[in-house]
Amino acid sequence: MDEDGLPLMGSGIDLTKVPAIQQKRTVAFLNQFVVHTVQFLNRFSTVCEEKLADLSLRIQQIETTLNILDAKLSSIPGLDDVTFEVSPVNVTRITNGTHSEATSEQSQQNSLQDSGPQESEVTPENILTVAKDPRYARYHKMVQVGVPVMAIRNKMISEGLDPDLLERPDAPVPDGEGEKNTEESSDSESSFSD
């Protein structure tokens, strides 16, 4: 002990004379902790389960809507002959107000000039393009109607078609598939309409 009566090392308490911790109190604290933790985990799992159920219901509704839209589009006669032009999407960054306006005007003029020669070109040897292929034409029609592109891409993947061709309607049909697959695609369309 120092001159003030404080211990130099340790607490200065003789641990052999200290009474034991009450076991009932310790058990009560542990039980309370376990009960509160379990209640929290139960509430958390209930909230997660409700959110997953809501999400699953929304996915089912979207899938049903997509199937109905697919059936409606497949029931439209003459949809095989539909062709359309897709204008390229121009992305410009806004750095200066006048610079971005000038760039957008130039890009619009360039796209108008580019579209002229494309229309006058004739596909050599009557190659079937994606826009004229009946399997891809209905997906292009879905894009025009306003169906989300990701849903259309997923549908194309599920049917074994290349979703990248959705953005390139002037590209030739892969593997030279043409009129012989028209009958197969109409059979597959009727299998989706419930």
From Swiss-Prot:
Subcellular location field: Early endosome
UniProt keyword annotation of Iron present: no
Region (Disordered) location: 98-125, 158-194
Biased composition (Polar residues): 98-123
Coiled coil feature spans: 46-74
Pfam families linked: CCDC53
Record key words, sorted: Acetylation, Coiled coil, Endosome, Protein transport, Transport
This protein's record includes keyword Coiled coil: yes
Primary localisation category: other
Record PTM N-acetylmethionine, positions in chain: 1
Superkingdom, taxonomy of origin: Eukaryota
BP term (GO), one: protein transport
One GO location term (cellular component): WASH complex
Family in the record: Belongs to the CCDC53 family.
Described purpose of this protein according to its UniProt entry: Acts as a component of the WASH core complex that functions as a nucleation-promoting factor (NPF) at the surface of endosomes, where it recruits and activates the Arp2/3 complex to induce actin polymerization, playing a key role in the fission of tubules that serve as transport intermediates during endosome sorting.
Subunit structure as annotated in this protein's UniProt entry: Component of the WASH core complex also described as WASH regulatory complex (SHRC) composed of WASHC1, WASHC2, WASHC3, WASHC4 and WASHC5. The WASH core complex associates via WASHC2 with the F-actin-capping protein dimer (formed by CAPZA1, CAPZA2 or CAPZA3 and CAPZB) in a transient or substoichiometric manner which was initially described as WASH complex.
Protein name: WASH complex subunit 3
